[in-house]
């Protein structure tokens, strides 16, 4: 007898794992540092089922804690699975609370897996004629499919697939769903550690089941098999039988099908709201709880475009691409290019929305749109160009949006004279100081526009940086942000110009009619993201950091990047010749010490020489493939074991110096400007520091003599001096401020050498009696201990025994007791909140701070100690940079800021501005933030970077 009822039974853990791993590269971390990926993904999946399928009855099955009958029968059952990720373990109780709030029954029976609970209920429901859907990605459920019982299978790329009898038969190439058990019994199931028959794969299993029908019949007729296959099957009869037992889902679990208890009920919205608020699912509340309910349950809104722009982070396609690290891959032979369509089915696109995107390609249209843009207080802008390097890119077009769902694209011709005329018409729009300029990586657009003689003026809002401030560990690209915050799938640039490679087109190759929708979408989506993210900034107490520190820095970086820096290429050529000869000499020394020639660049050959031939240590570390580990870290620890190790390290250092800097830097000179224009990245390091690329200036070695040759090649403009200013011991000063340690504060206020003062305290001697070795050890302790260095680590760094290292650390904390208290307090705060903060409330999330793994937890604890210090130092120099830039602007200073490296600022300064520039720079650096101890900046002058610093 058929029924109008529709029963959904969900396999909780299978879906939770899928949700967690869907976000594995970009986990969803809230302001408390809690990983909400599994919860968010599960809720979105549940909502999608409630909305799309409108079940009349529903239940969620969980595996019980403790072993099941399969574990008792087979100790290795699921033994190879990695321990449950801590984020999942912590999420499960919350997910259960959410399910309770939805008033959905949780189904759990001691000793039986969720598979067996669902199998029992689904089988009984099917017998009663109830249409039943088992929602799971696990392949073994295929054995339960009948006329009334279906698999509701999540696809790898999003969306769902309903599988009935014919679908299961087709996927497994079998005659009956019941034969799924026989297939698994023969081929095994690696995800559950079901052994199967060794040497029998899927195709062989299909062939055997097609011929014999079942494992039992196969084992009774092994005489019909031949050769190696016969031997395999006969040798493993017991294992095959046992594997089938493990793969068989039980349908007689002691649980009753009580349909009245599975009826879908109205959710407890107050409870859901409370949980979602605690998890900081603010926009999920808008999408799930503030819309009309249907069919007695909470459902997702279908949403207009306006609603979409304000909607919650909806899942990326919940089920990642094939080959990802996920549990229970559903049918190993599933294939297909479903990604694009499946993804679009879950997200809004331009095709599903009513947007007014206009191509502005006549003088009349341009004049009209300019007047319209000038009246707006907010302007979202974007540029289309010929390349990704802003100093070389040519404008192809400009797009603008001032109202959601409306945008305008202005093509710019190839002819530079004509292009300048059009861009110049829009100068009043860009230079209108009364309108807020919104962009996604707006620094790029500003540099491109300045190459056309136009400055972007007025307050700025960069959506990429806004998201970085909120979630520094995640990606910040527009496509990703649109999916997460707007539930929207953007047009990808590859759809216009093709995939990367030699055949990829240029935007200039396309007709404006083929570009304008893409370009308009960029400006429109950026405006929508701004409207969402500005609320998030306010709710997360991040407005000061964003508006007062990060945004004022953008025009500074535009200026630095456009200024560029000159290189003394002749000096680099001479250095190249010198270091190449030095490398060749060291090579010969290495061969003599080793007693043979070998490829020094080959880690394999280096390992064989060091550990097989020279046997410098007894037990050398190896990789999984059996190759010796010869990393820099390993060789550093072995430096004292044999002279050849020192030489190999020296050789590697020179090779890196040549390849990364000395020979590479001249290749980065822009032929148009004759300068190197490094790119400064505001959204890369989670610490808040700036990073740089092309070239990476942050990693230039500065302590050894060889590294100094690189700095010598950086020179000022003609008729100018090179000026360098850097903070003195800023991180120690911040530690003194944060810890409020009286002894450390007194040392700084007395203007003592902090390392000598520390040594005097530790060794209990007068300051005048501190020798160079004592000071060196105290300096190592000062910088090492604030980074949470261990006794072992300090001993290694100082090349002393652990007893002396421990005494030094104990003496340090006795000298600065409040420093130790600060360190302990920082860890405690991180454990309670999941994050720590800088002076300016920049958050560093530490999801592993409560990990049960001591190594992982220890790393998080060290970050808890150091992140507020390092991050505050980064914030302070950003403040100083913005203020110096403003002073230069208002006072008409011609000097240029040309480089920033960690705590150091560098300038090209006309000789006649020498005294004034030094005065401004030092004043602004030392007054960037008021602390318990003064900030101090040292400076120097020269004809190159090396002389100045």
Model-predicted segments: where are they?
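Short hydrophobic beta-strand that contains or immediately precedes a catalytic carboxylate
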Residues: 9-10, 134-136, 379-381, 460-461, ...
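Conserved catalytic core of nucleic-acid polymerases
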Residues: 505-508, 562, 670, 677-678, ...
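Extended, highly charged clamp/arch subdomains and adjacent linkers
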Residues: 1-62, 66-78, 90-97, 237, ...
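Extended two-metal-dependent nuclease catalytic cores across DNA- and RNA-processing enzymes
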Residues: 2-4, 25-29, 79-254, 483-485
């Amino acid at each position: 007898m058929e029924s109008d009822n529709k029963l959904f039974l969900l396999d909780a853990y299978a879906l939770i794992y899928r949700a967690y791993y869907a976000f594995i590269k970009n986990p969803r971390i809230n302001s408390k540092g809690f990983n909400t990926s599994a919860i968010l993904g599960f809720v979105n999946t549940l909502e999608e089922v409630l909305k799309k399928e409108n079940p009349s009855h529903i239940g969620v099955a969980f595996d019980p804690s403790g072993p099941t009958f399969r574990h008792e029968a087979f100790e290795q059952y699921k033994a190879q699975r990695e321990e449950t990720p801590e984020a999942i373990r912590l999420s499960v109780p919350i997910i259960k609370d959410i399910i309770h709030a939805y008033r959905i029954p949780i189904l759990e029976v001691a000793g039986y897996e969720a598979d067996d609970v669902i199998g029992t209920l689904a089988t009984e429901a099917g017998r009663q004629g109830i249409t039943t859907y088992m929602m799971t990605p696990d392949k073994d459920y295929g054995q339960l499919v009948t006329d009334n019982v279906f698999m509701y299978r999540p696809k790898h790329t999003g969306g769902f697939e309903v599988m009935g009898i014919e679908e299961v038969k087709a996927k497994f190439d079998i005659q009956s769903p019941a034969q799924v058990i026989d297939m698994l019994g023969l081929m095994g199931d690696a995800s559950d550690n079901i052994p199967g028959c060794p040497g029998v794969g899927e195709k062989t299993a299909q062939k055997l089941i097609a011929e014999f029908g079942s494992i039992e019949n196969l084992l009774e007729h092994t005489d019909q098999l031949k050769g190696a296959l016969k031997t395999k099957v006969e040798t493993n009869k017991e294992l095959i039988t046992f594997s089938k037992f493990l793969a068989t889902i039980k349908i007689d679990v002691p649980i009753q099908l009580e349909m009245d208890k599975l009826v879908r009920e109205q959710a407890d919205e107050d409870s859901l709201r409370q949980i979602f608020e605690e998890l900081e699912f603010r926009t999920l509340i808008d999408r799930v709880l503030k819309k009309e309910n249907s069919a007695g349950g909470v459902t997702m809104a279908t949403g207009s475009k306006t609603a979409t722009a304000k909607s919650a982070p909806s899942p990326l396609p919940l089920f990642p691409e094939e080959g990802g690290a996920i549990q229970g891959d559903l049918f190993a032979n599933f294939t297909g290019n479903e990604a694009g369509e499946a993804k679009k089915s879950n997200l809004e696109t331009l095709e599903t929305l009513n947007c007014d995107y206009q191509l502005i390609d006549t003088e009349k249209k341009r004049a009209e749109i300019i007047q319209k843009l000038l009246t707006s207080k907010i302007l979202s802008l974007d540029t289309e160009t010929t390349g990704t390097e802003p100093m070389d890119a040519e404008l192809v077009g400009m797009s603008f949006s001032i109202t959601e769902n409306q945008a305008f694209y202005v093509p710019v011709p190839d002819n530079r004279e004509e292009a300048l005329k059009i861009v110049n018409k829009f100068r009043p729009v860009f230079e209108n100081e009364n309108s807020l300029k919104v962009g996604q990586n707006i620094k790029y657009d500003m540099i491109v526009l300045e190459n056309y003689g136009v400055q972007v003026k007025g307050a700025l809002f960069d959506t990429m940086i806004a998201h970085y401030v909120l979630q520094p560990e995640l990606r910040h690209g527009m496509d990703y942000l649109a999916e997460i915050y707007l539930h929207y799938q953007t047009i990808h640039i590859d759809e216009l110009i093709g995939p990367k490679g030699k055949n990829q087109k240029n935007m200039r190759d396309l007709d404006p009619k083929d570009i304008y929708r893409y370009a308009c979408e960029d400006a429109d989506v950026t405006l929508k993201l701004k409207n969402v993210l500005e609320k998030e900034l306010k709710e997360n107490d991040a407005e000061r950091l964003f508006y007062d520190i990060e945004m004022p820095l953008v025009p500074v970086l535009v200026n630095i990047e456009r200024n560029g820096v000159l290189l003394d290429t002749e000096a680099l050529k001479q250095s190249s010749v010198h270091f190449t000869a030095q490398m060749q000499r060291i090579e010969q020394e290495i061969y003599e010490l080793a007693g043979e020639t070998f490829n020094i660049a080959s880690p394999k050959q280096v390992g064989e020489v060091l550990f097989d031939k020279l046997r410098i240590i007894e037990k050398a570390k190896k990789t999984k493939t059996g190759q010796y580990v010869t990393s820099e870290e390993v060789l550093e620890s072995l430096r004292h074991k044999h002279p050849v190790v020192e030489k190999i390290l020296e050789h590697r250092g020179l090779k890196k110096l040549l390849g990364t800097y000395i020979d590479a830097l001249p290749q980065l000179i822009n032929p148009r400007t004759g300068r190197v224009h490094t790119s400064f990245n505001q959204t890369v390091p989670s610490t808040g520091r700036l990073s740089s690329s092309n070239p990476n200036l942050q990693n230039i070695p500065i302590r050894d003599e060889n590294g100094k040759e690189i700095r010598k090649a950086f020179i000022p403009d003609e008729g100018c001096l090179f000026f360098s200013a850097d903070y003195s011991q800023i991180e120690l000063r911040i530690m003194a401020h944060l810890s409020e340690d009286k002894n450390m504060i007194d040392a700084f206020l007395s203007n003592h050498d902090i390392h000598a003062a520390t040594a005097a305290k530790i060794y209990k001697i007068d300051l005048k009696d501190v020798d160079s070795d004592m000071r060196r050890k105290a300096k190592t302790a000062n910088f090492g201990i604030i980074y949470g260095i261990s006794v072992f680590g300090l001993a290694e760094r100082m090349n002393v025994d652990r007893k002396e290292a421990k005494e030094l650390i104990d003496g340090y904390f006795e000298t600065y007791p409040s420093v130790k208290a600060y360190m302990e307090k920082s860890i405690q705060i991180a454990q309670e909140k999941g994050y720590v903060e800088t002076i300016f409330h920049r958050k560093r999330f530490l999801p592993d701070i409560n990990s049960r793994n001591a190594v992982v937890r220890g790393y998080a604890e060290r970050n808890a100690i150091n992140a507020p210090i390092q991050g505050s130092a980064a914030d302070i120099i950003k403040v100083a940079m913005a203020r110096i830039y403003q002073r230069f602007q208002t006072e008409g200073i011609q000097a240029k800021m040309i480089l920033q490296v960690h705590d150091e600022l560098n300038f090209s300064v006309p000789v006649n501005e020498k005294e004034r520039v030094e005065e401004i720079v030092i004043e602004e650096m030392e007054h960037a933030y008021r602390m318990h101890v003064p900030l101090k900046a040292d400076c120097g002058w020269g004809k190159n970077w090396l002389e100045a610093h």
